[in-house]
């Protein structure tokens, strides 16, 4: 679903970012695997790294990996780029020979 402006791709917080990513991946009508890695922490027991795997539709020749950032402010920009990629670019990709792995 295309956002009304590019600004709308930026999440307000971690939870919104996570929910938007998972919902957008779920909406894609293609073969996929959506997963998560739990991140243990002293104070926060609700941290996860979500990931989505889209296998090539035919023979694998290329792998494209897109990450959102490791920590701090770059994660918001990275999450916005991922949402724009999923909603606007992904549907236009010829996926016959490319696997796509997105680490959110």
Give the ranges of each region predicted by the language model.
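Structured catalytic-domain cores with a bias toward divalent-metal coordination
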Residues: 1-104
């Amino acid at each position: 679903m295309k956002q009304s402006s590019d600004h709308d791709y930026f999440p307000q917080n971690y939870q919104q970012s996570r929910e938007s990513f998972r919902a957008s991946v779920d909406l894609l009508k293609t073969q996929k695997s959506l997963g998560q890695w739990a991140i243990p922490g002293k104070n926060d027991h609700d941290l996860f790294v979500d990931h989505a795997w889209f296998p090539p539709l035919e023979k694998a020749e290329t792998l494209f990996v897109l990450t959102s950032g490791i920590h701090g402010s770059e994660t918001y920009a990275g999450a916005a780029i991922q949402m724009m990629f999923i909603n606007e670019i992904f549907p236009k990709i010829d996926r016959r020979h490319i696997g796509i792995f997105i680490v959110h």
